[in-house]
């Protein structure tokens, strides 16, 4: 019985370590990648630009994308 409990705890510890390593080893978000939920995760040469989505003047959503620093995007009509 003690062996089963010890084995279970050991497996739990191993799985926890693997998950922690995966989270810390995640790469940065590339150009035009969505960064809405992780605004600080763009690669070092990029910034996270956020835009408000409006419908009849009321904000209905917010979307963020990684874009180049010092680049301005304008709407083309």
Curated annotation (Swiss-Prot):
Propeptide, chain numbering: 21-26
Single GO MF descriptor: toxin activity
Record carries keyword Secreted: yes
Domain of life: Eukaryota
Localization (cell): Secreted
Stretch forming the signal peptide: 1-20
Keyword Nucleotide-binding: no
Entry comment describing in which tissues the protein is expressed: Expressed by the venom gland.
Posttranslational modification: Contains 4 disulfide bonds.
GO cellular component term of the entry, any: extracellular region
InterPro entries recorded: Spider_toxin_CSTX_knottin
Keyword annotations: Disulfide bond, Secreted, Signal, Toxin
Main location: secreted
Family in the record: Belongs to the neurotoxin 19 (CSTX) family. 10 (U11-Lctx) subfamily.
Protein name per its UniProtKB record: U11-lycotoxin-Ls1b
Protein's organism: Lycosa singoriensis
């Amino acid at each position: 019985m003690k062996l089963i409990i010890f084995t279970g705890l050991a497996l739990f510890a191993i799985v926890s370590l693997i998950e922690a390593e995966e989270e810390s080893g995640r790469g940065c978000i590339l150009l035009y990648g969505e960064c809405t939920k992780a605004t600080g995760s763009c690669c070092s040469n990029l910034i996270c630009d956020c835009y408000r989505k409006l419908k009849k003047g009321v904000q209905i959503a917010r979307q963020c994308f990684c874009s180049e620093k010092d680049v301005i995007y304008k709407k083309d009509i």
